[in-house]
């Protein structure tokens, strides 16, 4: 799940596909969100999406871009989790045989968030952070039985479910020793 490049920078589509669906305003990782919507719309079947080979492009951001802000933790990690949850819900209703793969995708997005959130933001008043930790804890047993997660994935999941901030503090200390 989510292999390859989901960026619209490398896709060629018919413009009439955009009459019903639009990029979600203000969201990051919007390419993935829109691609999933387009590919699962039964009324507006996509005849094909051409991918430009070689992905040797450069992305330039506007000065006021919401994609990259070096002064704060990017919302893209939260939007990735929201998209993973959207995919899981879609898969559970339409493609139930892929549910455990979609669940794995959501675990990966949550672990990625936990690996990148600044330690200073891992606080009790950060509602999104708390929801990620709660989700990791609530889904722990399901993750341990998931055949698509490796032992390493399950180890990270367990550590972040038990003591997320402590693990990050320890990781930072070990990283600085090397």
Describe each region flagged by the PLM.
Residues 6-7, 90-101, 152-158:
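Noncatalytic linker/hinge segments flanking ATPase motor cores
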């Amino acid at each position: 799940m989510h292999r390859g490049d989901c960026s619209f920078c490398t896709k060629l589509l018919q413009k009439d596909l955009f009459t019903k669906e639009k990029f979600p305003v203000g969201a990051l990782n919007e390419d993935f969100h829109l691609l999933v919507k387009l590919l699962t719309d039964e009324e507006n079947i996509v005849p094909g999406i051409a991918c430009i080979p070689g992905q040797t492009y450069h992305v330039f951001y506007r000065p006021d871009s919401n994609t990259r802000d070096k002064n704060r933790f990017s919302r893209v990690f939260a939007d990735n989790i929201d998209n993973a949850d959207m995919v899981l819900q879609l898969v559970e209703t339409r493609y139930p045989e892929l549910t455990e793969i979609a669940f794995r995708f959501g675990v990966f997005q949550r672990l990625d968030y936990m690996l990148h959130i600044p330690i200073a933001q891992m606080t009790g008043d950060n509602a999104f952070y708390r929801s990620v930790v709660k989700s990791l804890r609530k889904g722990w047993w399901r993750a341990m039985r998931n055949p698509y997660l490796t032992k390493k994935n399950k180890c990270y999941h367990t550590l972040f479910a038990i003591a997320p901030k402590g693990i990050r503090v320890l990781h930072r200390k070990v990283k600085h020793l090397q």
